[in-house]
């Protein structure tokens, strides 16, 4: 086993030296590539500071953005090509150190690069070289998830919790507070879940198995522990600020705040267990672990009671909304005042007091406007009575009366206002139930004669005139059938048309001109029957010239030209 491990170390050292020689010859960024290869070699020890300083200088704000992008690309290529857990872990340590101690522009460039491709995606990474490598590979995957969540938290918060300088609330106070203490309710509900998710990934970096005693993993775990203190401090200050604003929130915000408060209590217990596990490691000598206290559970009951009575909506903001109603300023007082007919239809403001002993007054007779109104419920006119015949006869006498068209005829309003717009399709669905009913009052001629009645009189006269018999001519038989093709049967089509209609072309014409024996047979000439179904089922017979019978088969006649089942001679 020891010989195999020694061989693997020698093979790794050979690969590192070969890689360094290649990048010095082929790379444009030779110094940067050499520093990355030496900082992430196969030796199980933390990256050296001299190599890290070269990488920090290549990603500083004074360098071009192309140099920073090349450094990120080189680290990503180194991370995804290796299958050794030591190289992968040391590459993640370099990235973590750059996030903590590097230039702020590096975080922005790394965030932009991660949006195009997940640089820290190591969910399928596994080193099968030894059983110890299995446990170390599992911790490498967990560590990569923490760094990825740290980058996502930076995207939400727009600042780094580790690089943040905690200001002091009072001049004489030693301990400062984070930015979450001064956030408003909306920002607080957005940033606290991101911080809690980062703390969840941090607690998951607890080493297990053979990874507990590896000094490279403990070096990376020390970086994680340093960040846990400020992350917990930011969450704790945010919870205090959340409690102060809780009773001013709406119901949906209060429910979200309650979930954050419950999760904060659970994570406090999990973080305490994580600290207890780290106290047994060698790195515990360099840390002073804080004492964590869970949020009081009594306040949790108060929050649940408030949610039951919390308002469902928030107050309407003072600023105008996007869709607001504004009255039309272009309307004048004449347009807004009702007309005389509308005043009659509006209810009066006078209140008549009627005693219980007096009988109610009879209803007033319907007005002329109400009589002209058309009931839209009776669209078919089933409830409308037949018009009086005497009235129609009196109106027919004035059908041809001349009426002056100088003055425009009054149009019925049907209880509509003066500014009624008939072009609206919504109003047309209601006010125009049928074309016949709505236009009945508009078809009035002089004297009140209806145009439909006048048209029906003319139609009746035209029908009676057409039914009168003409003397001297026989009446046509309505049951006689006429052949539409009778006029074209007696005329032979042109030769071009015959060639088109003949499917066998010139062959059949040549065959027909050959003399063939015919048999004597007295056949009846075809009669011209107008019935198109008279000869149904018979074969068509073409008249041919009678030739003498020389075959000796008697008088049995066979017409080879007209047999549709005869042989064409093609076989």
Swiss-Prot record:
Its main location: membrane. It is found in: Membrane, Clathrin-coated pit; Golgi apparatus; Cytoplasmic vesicle, Clathrin-coated vesicle. Residues 325-346, 474-571 are annotated as: Disordered. GO terms for biological process: clathrin coat assembly; clathrin-dependent endocytosis. Keywords: Coated pit, Cytoplasmic vesicle, Endocytosis, Golgi apparatus, Membrane. GO terms for cellular component: clathrin-coated pit; clathrin-coated vesicle; Golgi apparatus; mitochondrion; plasma membrane. Residues 523-532, 543-571 have a biased composition (Polar residues). InterPro entries: ANTH_dom, ANTH_dom_sf, ANTH_N_plant, AP180-like, ENTH, ENTH_VHS. Residues 24-161 form the ENTH domain. It comes from the Eukaryota. Residues 337-346 have a biased composition (Basic and acidic residues). Residues 508-522 have a biased composition (Low complexity). Pfam families: ANTH. One of its GO terms (molecular function) is 1-phosphatidylinositol binding. Gene3D superfamilies: 1.25.40.90, ANTH domain. This is Putative clathrin assembly protein At2g01600. The lineage of its organism: Eukaryota, Viridiplantae, Streptophyta, Embryophyta, Tracheophyta.
């Amino acid at each position: 086993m020891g010989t195999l491990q020694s061989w693997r170390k020698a093979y790794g050292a050979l690969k590192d030296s070969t890689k360094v020689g290649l990048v010095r010859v082929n790379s444009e960024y030779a110094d940067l590539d050499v520093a990355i290869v030496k900082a992430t070699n196969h030796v199980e020890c933390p990256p050296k500071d001299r190599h890290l300083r070269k990488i920090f200088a290549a990603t500083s704000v004074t360098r071009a953005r192309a140099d920073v992008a090349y450094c990120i690309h080189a680290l990503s290529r180194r991370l995804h090509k290796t299958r050794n857990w030591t190289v992968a872990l040391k590459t993640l340590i370099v990235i973590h150190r750059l996030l903590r101690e590097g230039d702020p522009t590096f975080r922005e460039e790394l965030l932009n690069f991660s949006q195009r491709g997940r640089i820290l995606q190591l969910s399928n990474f596994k080193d099968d070289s030894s059983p110890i490598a299995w446990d170390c590979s599992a911790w490498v995957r967990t560590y990569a998830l923490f760094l990825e969540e740290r980058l996502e938290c930076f995207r939400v918060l727009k600042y780094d919790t580790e690089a943040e300088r905690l200001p002091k609330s009072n001049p004489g106070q030693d301990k400062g507070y984070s930015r979450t203490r001064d956030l408003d309710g909306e920002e607080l509900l957005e940033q606290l879940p991101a911080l809690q998710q980062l703390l969840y990934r941090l607690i998951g970096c607890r080493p297990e198995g053979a990874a507990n005693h590896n000094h490279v993993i403990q070096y990376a775990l020390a970086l994680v522990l340093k960040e846990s203190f400020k992350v917990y401090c930011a969450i704790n200050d945010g919870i205090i600020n959340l409690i102060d604003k809780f009773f001013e929130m709406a119901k949906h915000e209060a429910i979200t705040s309650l979930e954050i408060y419950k999760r904060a209590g659970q994570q406090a217990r999990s973080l305490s267990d994580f600290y207890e596990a780290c106290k047994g490691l060698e790195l515990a000598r360099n840390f002073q672990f804080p004492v964590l206290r869970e949020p009081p559970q009594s306040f949790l009951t108060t929050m649940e009671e408030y949610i039951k009575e919390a308002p469902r909506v928030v107050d309407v903001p003072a600023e105008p909304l996007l869709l607001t109603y504004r009255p039309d300023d272009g309307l004048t007082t004449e347009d807004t005042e009702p007309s005389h007919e509308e005043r009659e239809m509006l209810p009066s403001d006078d209140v008549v007091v009627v005693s219980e002993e007096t009988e109610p007054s009879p209803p007033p007779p319907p007005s002329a406007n109400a009589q002209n109104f058309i009931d839209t419920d009776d669209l078919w006119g089933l409830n409308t009575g037949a018009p009086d015949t005497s009235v129609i006869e009196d109106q027919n006498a004035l059908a041809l009366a001349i009426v002056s068209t100088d003055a425009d005829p009054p149009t019925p309003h049907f209880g509509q206002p003066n500014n009624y717009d008939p072009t609206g399709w919504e109003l047309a669905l209601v006010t125009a139930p049928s074309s016949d009913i709505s236009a009945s009052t508009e078809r009035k001629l002089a004297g009140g004669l209806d145009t439909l009645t006048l048209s029906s009189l003319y139609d009746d006269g035209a029908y009676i005139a057409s039914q009168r018999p003409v003397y001297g001519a026989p009446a046509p038989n309505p049951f006689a059938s006429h052949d539409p093709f009778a006029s074209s049967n007696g005329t032979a089509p042109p030769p071009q048309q015959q060639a088109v209609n003949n499917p066998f072309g010139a062959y059949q014409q040549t065959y027909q001109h050959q003399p063939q024996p015919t048999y004597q047979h007295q056949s009846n000439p075809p009669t011209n029957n107008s019935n198109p179904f008279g000869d149904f089922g018979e074969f068509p017979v073409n008249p041919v010239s009678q030739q003498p019978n020389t075959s000796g088969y008697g008088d049995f006649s066979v017409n080879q030209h007209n047999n549709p089942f005869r042989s064409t001679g093609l076989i």
